[in-house]
């Protein structure tokens, strides 16, 4: 093989490799003059236009074209506007490089194009290699945005779940410890005295007494009435609008200054039997049988 033939073959191989290295935008389904491609910083993008026709390249919506370097600025006009770049060739141009820089909140991006122009008899969509518009897509950015949105949603869901859990926990703290049903409580209480201190309800489960006051009233001092008629300060815990005392008593005395209200347990059982079973255990029920003679 002669040296000239070798050089010719090498040039052909280089041209073929270069052609394959360029990224050609995909023609639109409705009009091949509308072109689309995914951004790849390692690829040279091929642009083809007609002499005298305008070609627009659309970058990411959050990008701004900051610099354009063309090889032949005399015969190729380049006009940036925001995330758009307009080209217009005034004469036939062989393929030549154009370098574009854009800026966004994410940083700088570089685009490298190989643009050429030719004379066409008309500019309809049947013309081959006639680009009117080239629009970039950003799959990696979209995937990162979806991942970020999913992570933010996961964090928001976790915060919401923690808040709901906290709300439920606070709600439980504001409820009395006696969680038995209404039929399992002793509601046999009567009041005597100043009814301005009257609770909404009073009940017990045989071991714990609960006073339920309106949420907007001041809770009075509570005393237990001993068998000798004397009163003793009752130790209680406040859970929201409920006051819980870990004992039962025949009578209670509520005081707020000179205002007094007595509450009597008409079903008082000093043994502390559960109302629903009649025994001290919830799993043991008292049953009365008829004695046959």
UniProtKB/Swiss-Prot annotation:
Signal peptide boundaries: 1-21
GO BP annotation list: protein secretion by the type IV secretion system
InterPro entries for the chain: Conjugal_tfr_TrbG/VirB9/CagX, VirB9, VirB9/CagX/TrbG_C, VirB9/CagX/TrbG_C_sf
GO cellular component term, pick one: plasma membrane
Topological category with respect to the lipid bilayer: Peripheral membrane protein
Cell compartment(s), UniProt: Cell membrane
UniProt entry keywords in alphabetical sequence: Cell membrane, Crown gall tumor, Disulfide bond, Membrane, Plasmid, Signal, Virulence
Chief localisation class: membrane
Top-level taxonomic group: Bacteria
NCBIfam families: PRK13861.1 (NF010435), VirB9 (TIGR02781)
Subunit structure: Heterodimer of virB7 and virB9; disulfide-linked.
Record family assignment: Belongs to the TrbG/VirB9 family.
Protein role: Is essential for the biogenesis of the T-pilus, which is required for virulence and T-DNA transfer to plant cells. When is associated with virB7, might function as a nucleation center for recruitment of VirB proteins during assembly of the T-DNA transfer machine.
Protein name per Swiss-Prot or TrEMBL: Protein virB9
């Amino acid at each position: 093989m002669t040296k000239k033939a070798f050089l010719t073959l090498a040039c052909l191989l280089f041209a073929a490799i270069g052609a394959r290295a360029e990224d050609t935008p995909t023609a639109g389904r409705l009009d091949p003059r509308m072109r689309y491609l995914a951004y790849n910083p390692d690829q040279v993008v091929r642009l083809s236009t007609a002499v005298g026709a305008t070609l627009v390249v659309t970058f990411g919506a959050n990008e701004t074209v900051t610099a354009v370097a063309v090889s032949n600025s005399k015969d190729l006009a380049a006009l940036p506007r925001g995330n758009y770049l307009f080209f217009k060739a005034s004469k036939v141009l062989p393929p030549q490089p154009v370098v574009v820089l854009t800026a966004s909140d994410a940083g700088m991006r570089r685009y490298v194009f190989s643009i050429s122009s030719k004379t066409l008899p008309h500019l309809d969509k049947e013309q081959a290699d006639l680009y009117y518009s080239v629009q970039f897509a950003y799959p990696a950015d979209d995937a990162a945005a979806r991942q970020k949105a999913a992570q933010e949603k996961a964090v928001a869901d976790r915060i919401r779940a923690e808040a709901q859990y906290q709300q439920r926990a606070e709600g439980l703290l504001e409820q009395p410890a006696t969680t038995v049903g209404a039929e399992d409580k002793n509601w046999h209480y009567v009041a005597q005295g100043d009814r301005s201190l009257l609770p909404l309800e009073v009940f017990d489960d045989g071991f714990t007494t609960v006073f339920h006051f309106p949420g907007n009233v001041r809770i009075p001092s509570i005393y237990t009435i001993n068998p000798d008629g004397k009163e003793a300060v009752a130790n209680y815990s406040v859970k929201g609008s409920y006051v819980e005392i870990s004992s039962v008593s025949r009578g209670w005395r509520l005081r707020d200054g000179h205002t007094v209200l007595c509450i009597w347990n008409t079903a008082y059982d000093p043994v502390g039997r559960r109302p629903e079973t009649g025994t001290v255990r919830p799993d043991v029920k008292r049953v009365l049988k008829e004695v046959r003679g």
